């Protein structure tokens, strides 16, 4: 989870001394010990007793006699372990953060209320099927049992952050699902970026030279560039920087938008003779205890072990007795920006084709904690205007009051179906059943990869993606006389494959559309380097064991580097001042190893080279903004490097004509000066790990004194944004790692004792709790832990035993 809702906690805590001073000693010690997890505990709402066993890592394994009690108990146990986290999720997702933390949460609340996530969720909740409604309500009932009946057991962090827990409703649950949907969406940001480029260069040049290049190694026709024929309108008078707040609104769960790897191998490639599922979701999970909550779920009909997102029932990654499944972000384009016009002389109306319509006006009242206000709160009314497409995201409230506006249309706002899909995963018995469940997921945009006990493997992308008459969603489009959205891609025609002949399947946020795909699914995907490495290894894989799958997750081989390294070496060999760079890079095998000098030189040089290529024409602000979105430009730039005399490499600020080698040498001089200042003159003694580092922090102390004590000490890390060992840093923002494998999991359907997995943190979100970060040593060392699957193994390894008793 991101930083927004923890700002208040960090400000309030300041230092550990505040935590100790603000609370009675008994409360402080209770927080260290954590929730009561042994003995009997009364739980309102249960129909029968439920047993909860915990292993040495604190992972709960829940044994219930029926499904309703199982999911209620999961909600209860999740609240025991993660109440601080789930209350933060709700405050952000519902636009009620300022009510808890005051002014620090107001900007987030304004943006969330403008988007209307709660309004959309309330409509969605009314449409849910009885099965979906029950599944969500059972979980809410369990959380509420802990919130209302065990207030003396709540974590002290709630008080520090200003949260006052209250019972969860069905609408709260659905709102969180819609927030997950929003936080996964990346096309909105990409559309804004492309509009800025259109404003700068004009539509022809921007769409011809700068649209993302989408590569699927399995396609014969390469590459695909979509949207180039679509209409584009310059908005030069419009300062769309004013929209930056909408991007920031997704920050609290923006980690969900980044990436992941998943793959599966069939029987012919595994040592066990059974199918194997592998998943390592890439998120910003530096804030402890991480995002995923490991859990085991057992009834007479259900046997499941894996990881769940707190507030989402069931498991999102893991296995059952019959199937296993894992997820990556699919980047299905579910949002569009539309260029709207205010009706001449009618400021409260807009032009819709040949009609003039009144804006829908929605008033959102935001409650803000304020010690100087009567009763401790003040109120602000936000006036939201909306067209038939969606809310206006520009206008007087953002400081712009022209006659051209942008509206945001979201598929999640357009009455999804009654199912949620996630409730079907626990009872799926085959890959066909998982595929059916995936097709029912309207508001979650994942690439599911899955396997079954019979050896079947498959993949399906989820969510609702509009069928666009314009066949483009890459940049804002003017409102026309007819609706651009002509329904949605049929779920069975979303990208996917079942039982491929090669007996493996994988995704890495890449373009998975085959040749001739009929729909404009998206214009925004990860570069192809990770999926190419997966294919390179799995195509040769025979008799693969769990250790082989782990080795592939930890693989630091960079397949992007060979595209640029030869040009870099050639340019540097002609430059005596940088001959050592040339020697180091030429000898490099392409591994982004933390102990090598070459990766540091390569990545620093690559980033500077890309920046120098575009800054002369874009300017610093636009260049950094666009290049900060790696997926938007990387394949495009790497292809551009094949043409070293491209006009883009010419610096228009100088009288001479520069080429790629000239910019390589210029960039090398800048990089050398920066790195020498930090690490000394001898480049051969530098290492990637000198700068490419990762740290984990407590919500109470993100930086400064005590950060490593409350969190987990900073350390060097191998990998990069282009490797399967994902370790992505912000563009030109230093090399500290922000996005990485938040969990690593291998589910071998031939091993009925266990799933082997690890999370980048722990189970419990309480400061100083022994299970807040106890899986990090294994994670940093590249080891997997046993998450027990067989009930007898759970019994044998239980160190805590609790019975939840109906009340």
What are the residue ranges of the model-derived segments?
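Charged, long alpha-helical assembly modules
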Residues: 605-689
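Hydrophobic alpha-helical segments
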Residues: 335, 397, 404, 443-541, ...
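Glycine- and hydrophobic-rich flexible loops that cap the catalytic core of alpha/beta enzyme folds
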Residues: 257, 297-314, 318-323, 327-484
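Terminal end segments
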Residues: 520-579, 662-807
